[in-house]
Structures are given as structure tokens and as C-alpha cells.
Amino acid sequence: MASSKNMPSRITQKSMEPPLRETWQQVVQEMVMRKQRDEEEKQNLVTGKEKSWVSIDLLGTKQEGKRQKVNIWGPWEKWGIKIVWVMLWVIQLMLWGCLIWEMGKKHSCNAEEVIALVDDPGGFQKVKYVESVPVTCMTKNFTQWGCQPEGAYPDPDLEYRNISQDILEQVYKQEWPWNTYHWPLWQMENMRQWMKENEKEYTSRNNKTKEDIDALLAGKIRGRFCVPYPFALLKCEEWCWYPANINQETGHAQQIKINCTKAKAVSCTEQMPLAAVQRVYWEKEDEEGMKFMNIQACNESQLRCKTSPGGCVQGYPIPVGAEIIPESMKYLRGKKSPYGGIKDKNGELKLPLSVRVWVRMANLSGWVNGTPPYWSARIKGSTGINGTRWYGIGTLHHLGYNISSNPEKGLCNFTKELWIGGDRFQYQYKPSWNCSQNWTGYPVWHVFRYLDMTEHMTSRCVQRPLRHNITVGNGTITGNCSVTDWEGCNCTRSGNYLYNSTTGGLLVIICRQNSTITGIMGTNTNWTTMWGIYKNCSECKNSTLDRTDNGTLGTVNNINCSLPHYNESNKWTCAARNSKKKRDSLYIAGRDFWGRVKALYSCESNLGGLDGMMHQQMVLQKYQVIKVRAYTYGVVDMPKAYREKNMRNKRSTEISRPRKKRGIGLVIVLAIMAIIAAAGAGLGVANAVQQSYTRTAVQSLANATAAQQNVLEATYAMVQHVAKGVRILEARVARVEAIVDRMMLYHELDCWHYQHYCVTSTRTEVAQYVNWTRYKDNCTWQQWEEEIEQHEANLSLLLKEAALQVQIAQRDAQRIPDVWKALQEAFDWSGWFSWLKYIPWIVVCIVGVICFRLLMCVITMCLQAYRQVREIRYTRVTVVIEAPVDLEEKQREERDGSSGSENLEHEKRTSPRSFIQIWRATVQAWKTSPWGKGWKKILYMTLLPLLTLQIWMEETGWNGDKRCKKKKERVDCQDRESMPAIENEYVELS
């Protein structure tokens, strides 16, 4: 029973009763829940957490679960998530935009613009002073002539480089200049020296002597002139001429410029004779080169001469001011010019040319029997025709022979002379060529001068009109006429007419063939001024300049009242000078309207007359010396990482030294100065450049390819330009060498290679005086030179700024501050110690006063001793000549009226002492005096000879009897009792 009571009852509550029937799904769910509770309990035991809290509601039901806490930040978290989400989208859009913007840029890497030297195959620099360019010749006979063998330089016909027309125009600006090349002058000097050295040997020769020298004299030895790298020759292949600087008063062209439109760069010239004497006919191999010198007028210039009957002038214009033989080789000039029209105003070659000279290959098609056209129609004995004066018509000098100007005659006469420049040498030789041959077809030089220099208006030379043949047209001239516009002017009758210009001056219009205007001369002087001068001429008040029908061209009524001019005394006159029934022929010139002109022709011409030197000089004018530049300046983008890496690697190899970090202001100024100096950089290599050429660069140069050599050459040139800038600063700033050393030591000027560029550390933003960005990616050397020329005016400003930067850099670079200078700047001590400059004068004055006092002391002591010794002498003399008894008796006798014969006898008994006696007495007196003792003894001993001499002279009477008498009277009148007692007076009396 008891056991049965203790057992639980099977009867439970309805809720606790198991379901009668459970589904499978309920069973699985219950098992899962139990499993989860077990795992949760295990996890709590492991982590040490307490068991979930238990709550009992009012019905007594247990509720297990976690406590639900209230979150007060819930709303904020909800909106914060949204804000963060929006910000992330904004950042994402910004990143996408930056990415798209960077992709749109040319360079996506982080870089900075730096100045660099880039490859420029067509770059070159013109050389203004060709005297400094090295040159050599190349020929087959190189051993005899001292030249290089053929093949030493590239053949210009096979190896050359074309130059674009844009670069030509940019560099030379449509002006191909004249150059006086020194190479032909050297050849001429060698020939002249060789002839002078062998001048004595030539006297033994005859005309049968034949040797190889005739080939040299005749110009058979041909060769080329070549220049070494980096120099080259720019050969013009197409050119034309055009006028420039037209004078608005006279109408003449002050300059004729040459425009080269096609050229190529070569190393050597064409074949030409290396040396030759004066000749007329040249070889047919030279015809092509001579014909090229017949330059025609440019088509774009629209010159008036193109529509004139004679056309425009053809030839090469040697400009006004050209110097044929420079001053350094003046010994080659000679007395007179041997080249015909190529001469100065005095007919020599000492001065530059005063008139433009044209040289061309002669066109002899219209010549008849060796004379120019219409030569037979000239006035008999005249040397000119159609306004041109001809020289050398008839006979010409050709290689030592007088040859006819008619090439078909073949007349030759040997002159036994060779003309080389202005010198003539006697020489006998038998040429291997035939002088008497038919020279038709051989090229000849034609030299002519247009004295009025109006080639752009007409090519016809006119005979200048006489002044009395200039008249007023009176309706003959119509239209608008001026010296620069001939097209609007018309004439109806041949003559020389005075006409008003449309510009306000006066014109002389030359009309021929009743309708053709062949020349117009002008001046700014108007009609009113001219007429006032005309009326002031004597006998011309009632005269006019109207035309009379005397002559074909007409003349004035009174020939003594012609157009005014300046006479030989530089005074106005209207009449020509008369002398012995002869009258001066006065003409009017285009460039000298009021002058006294006596030249009839406006042109001068001659055939031949040129030697090998002038032939080479003319042919070489188609060449210009240039300096090849295989690089140019540009702006490139250098990655900063690459730059920093190279700088770090390079500096790690050097010895690190502690220094104060400074700015790059000095480097900037030096770089700018180097840039400014680049256009005029010298041809030599500076020592600084050689030192900066490191061992690594030399090894790289030895192993480099062609492209790398260009890069290294650019590097070399950049450093050379910097060195040139340093040399410029050296002349203006002190101690630049130390600054350059500091630059090199601190690597403030570096150069490295990046994508075939030589890049410096100078950034573009610091180059304030050069617009680098203008030439980015397409900068050429020519553009660089043009940019440099525009900034040369800032050179003084740059030098001042450079000097300031140098001073600042020197101040910052000092390790120990200069305390003295700092104090001097803080306190102006300049006026405090200004009196110190007088200290030397004060010292000199003090020393001078001391010396003067010492001298006066010595002199005073000497004078005092002299007086005392002299007083002793007088005392002794007084005792010697004293006779007390006799004096009293004599006085008494004289009072009694005696004649004084006793006195005379007594005077006869006393005789003057000798010099030795006086010397002894003086020495004895000196010994007994205080001056003969102590340190003064030697000093005053020097006075004894002088004192003895003076006493002896007084004794002998040389100083006069008057003094002796006075002494005697003074002694005789003395009282005996007043005289002192002397110890040795009896010694003297005996």
C-alpha cells in the first residue's frame, strides 16, 4: 500500500496528457528544437554565460527567453545607412569621372614638363663668319697640291640632304648673302708666293720650255673645297633676285637681294680649277656653274623691267659695301683693280664697292667680230655705245697671251707675263694647249656696273643727258609720273624733260623714239626752290628752260642758263666752265641730281679680266656655310617617378655632404643665360664641358648606336651652352667658378636619357623669358634661333638678375656668418673711423718735426762752438800785437806833432802769419776750450779747417784792408789795463 501511494498518479491535467495521436512532422520539429536547446546550453557552459532568465506570469506559467532591450539610436541608424549609401555613390561617380578625364588626356602618368633636346634631322645653324670655318681641298693630284685624296669626303652628287623651303625662308628670310671666302684667297697667295720664290729661275727659261706647270696655270688641275663635320655647305639650286630699300627720292634700289627657294646640304663644292692666272675663256666643264650665276628676277615681285623691251637684268649682283680682298690680305690688292668693273670709286680694291656690280656668263650671240651690238654705229673713237662704256674691246689678256676679243680669229701674242691678281710676273713657258684655236663656245665672264642702279625698272643703259639739253616739256609729258612709278607716265616726243613729280619733287624724264621712257631721275627739291636758284644765276633773270628746236633732243635758248648745279667750289651756277674756248660737258646722274657729273655713260662693262681667285669667288656664292644641328629644343613630359629614381641612383654614387637646402634660383638664371647665349655659342670646347664629360658618357659614346650618338651630341651641346652662359656671367660676376663647382657638386644641373631625349632639371615654368610651350612637339632649331633673337634685348636685365641671384646664393652658401660684415651692415661705421686715414700724415709730420729739431740742435751747437773758438782767436791776436810802452810813446809823439815815422817802422817789422801758424794757434785754442772735450770733440773738429782758412784769408788781406784797419784801430784804442792777462802771450811775441 505504501509503495502504491508513493507512485505518481497516472491521472494528470488535460494539458499534460500526451496527444493521442502525433504526426510525423510534429515529431521532427520537436526533435530539432531539443537539439537546438542542447547546443545552446553547451555553448553557454563553454562561454561562461548564465542561463537564460525565467519569468512566471500571473497564471504561474514559466516563460524562458532573452531580455529584449530598447535601442534609442534606431532611427538614426536607419537614416545614417541611407546617407552613407548616397555618399558612396557620389564618390563612385567622381572616381569614374576622374578616370574618364585622365583617359582623355594624352599622358595618363604623373609627369612634369621639362626642357629637352630632341632629334631634328633637318636642323642647321647658319655661320656668319666663314673665316673661322676649317676647309680643305680634295683632288686627284693631292700630293702635289697639298690636298686630300678623292673619296676622303662624301660625293656631293650622291650624298646630300634636301632642305625644305620653309626652313630656308625661316633661316635666311629671303636673303642669300654675299660671302668673301678666304679659300680662293689662300690659293691665290700660294700661287703668288710660289712665283716670287722662283722668280730668278724664270729668267733662264725660253718659250720652248715645257713642264707640268702649264696645267696648273691654265686651271687644268681641278678639285673641290670641303668642310668637316659639324659644318656643311648649303648649295642653292634655285634662286632669283628682287629689289629692296627703294630710295623714294632718286628711285634707285639700294639693295638687290637674292631669294633661294631650293637648296641641299652637302660636304663639298662642285669641281672647279684650284688655281689659275687671269684669263678670258674658261673650260667647258665650268659652263654649267657659270651659267647658274645668271640669276633672273623673281616672278612674284612684278617688276617694271619685265614689261620693258630689254627685259630684266640677269646675273649675280655683288652688293654695295662688299670687300673683295679683306684688309688682312691687302698685299694681294695691287695698285689698280685688275678685274675691270669690280673696283671701288677710286678704281682700286682698297675700299668697299660703292656701286653694285653684276657678274654673269656673257651672251655673245649678238656680237659681231668680237664687238657688242651696234658697235659700228658709235662715234668714231668712242669707247661706248647705247649708254655703256666698254673696256678691253679688241685685245684681251688670256694666260699670258694677248688674245683677240673675236673668238673666231684665234690671234695670240705671247706677252711673257702672267697676271696673278695685281702682280705681273715674267715667265717663259710653252703651253700644251693651242692658243690660236677657235674659242667660240667657251664660257666668258661679263662684268658690268649700273651706276644709276635702277635695274628693277629697266635693263637698258642710257646716255646721260647734258644739262643744257634738259628743257620744259610744254605738254610733251602727260600722266602721273614719279621715280617709283613709270607706268602712268607717257611722252610724245624724244627729249629730256623737266616735270613735276606726283610726290612733290622734280623729275627729269628721258624719252626716246618719241614714245619710250628709258629713264626717270628725281629729287625732292620742288619747282619753286629750283626756280629761285635759277633766277639768282647771272644773266638768267629773263631766261627760261623752254625747249628750242636746236638738235634732235632740243636745248635751252641760252646754254649759260641751263638747269642749276653745284660747281667745283660747291656753289650754285647755271653755266658750265669755259677754258681756252673749251666748254665742260656736264651731265645729270640719277643719284646725283644737282652734282657736277662728267661721266657720259650710265653703265660700264668688260669681258673677261677675272683670274682663278675671282672665278672661285663667284662660283662659291651659290654655297652658304652652315653648322649641322642634329637636335633641337623642345618640351617633353618626364614622369616624376622616373626622374626621382634617376636622381636617387645618381646621387647615391657620389659622396654625400651635409649642406643647407637651397632653391634653384641660381640654376634657373644660369640656364636662362645659357639659353640666351646658345645662338652665339662659340665653335670651341670649353674646359668645363670637357670636365663634365664623365667616363660613363665616353664609354656610352663608344658603344652607342647612331641614334644614341645624336642624343649624346645633344647632351654635349646643352652642357656647352651652359658653359657659354657661365663664360658670359664670368665677365660680369665675380667668383662664378665657385658657383659652377657648387652646381656640379650638388647636382643642381643634371642630364639623363629618357625616350631618346636629353632632359635637364630646368622646368618650363621657370623659363620666364622664353615661350617654350609655343614650340612643343614641333620646335625646330630655326624656330629656336628666332626665339633667341627676340629675347637678346633682355640680356642686360638677365645679367643684372643673374648677378643678384649669384650674390644671394653666395650669401646662403656661407657656412660661418661673417660677424664683421653683419655688424658693419647693422651699424654704419663708415663715418666713425674716417679720421684714421689721416694717421699716416700725422706720424710723418711728427717724425719730420723731431728730425728738424735734431738738425737745428746740431746746427746751433756748431754755431756756438764756432763763435767761442773765434772769440778766443781774437783775444790771442790782441795780446800778440799789443805794445804798451810803444803805444804811449807813440801817442805822446803824435800829440807833439811828429810825423809818425816810428809807426811805419813798427808796421814794417810785423809780418802776417803763415797758414801753419794759424792752424797751430787755432788747434791750441780749440784744445783749451770746453768744445775740445768729451763727445763733442769729434763733432766740432770739422769746424777747425773752415775757421783756419777764414783767419788766414783775413791775415793775408783777401777779405779787404778795411777790416784789418778796423781791427788795428780797435786794438790801438784799447786800454792796457782793460785787457786780460794771457798765459802764452810771450810765446807769440817771441
UniProtKB/Swiss-Prot annotation:
Residues 1-107 form the signal peptide. The mature envelope protein (Env) consists of a trimer of SU-TM heterodimers attached by noncovalent interactions or by a labile interchain disulfide bond. It comes from Ovine maedi visna related virus (strain South Africa). Residues 695-745, 786-821 form a coiled coil. Residues 108-838 are extracellular. One of its GO terms (cellular component) is virion membrane. The surface protein (SU) attaches the virus to the host cell by binding to its receptor. This interaction triggers the refolding of the transmembrane protein (TM) and is thought to activate its fusogenic potential by unmasking its fusion peptide. Fusion occurs at the host cell plasma membrane. A lipid is attached at C862 (S-palmitoyl cysteine). Gene3D superfamilies: ATP synthase delta/epsilon subunit, C-terminal domain (1.20.5.440). Glycans are attached at residues 141, 162, 207, 259, 299, 363, 386, 402, 413, 434, 438, 469, 474, 480, 490, 500, 514, 526, 536, 542, 550, 560, 567, 703, 771, 778, 794. This is Envelope glycoprotein gp160. Residues 890-909 are annotated as: Disordered. The record marks R662, G663 as: Cleavage. Residues 729-745 are annotated as: Immunosuppression. GO terms for biological process: symbiont entry into host cell; virion attachment to host cell. Keywords: Cleavage on pair of basic residues, Coiled coil, Disulfide bond, Glycoprotein, Host cell membrane, Host membrane, Host-virus interaction, Lipoprotein, Membrane, Palmitate, Signal, Transmembrane, Transmembrane helix, Viral attachment to host cell, Viral envelope protein, Virion, Virus entry into host cell. Residues 663-683 are annotated as: Fusion peptide. Residues 860-990 are cytoplasmic. Specific enzymatic cleavages in vivo yield mature proteins. Envelope glycoproteins are synthesized as an inactive precursor that is N-glycosylated and processed likely by host cell furin or by a furin-like protease in the Golgi to yield the mature SU and TM proteins. The cleavage site between SU and TM requires the minimal sequence [KR]-X-[KR]-R. The chain crosses the membrane at residues 839-859.
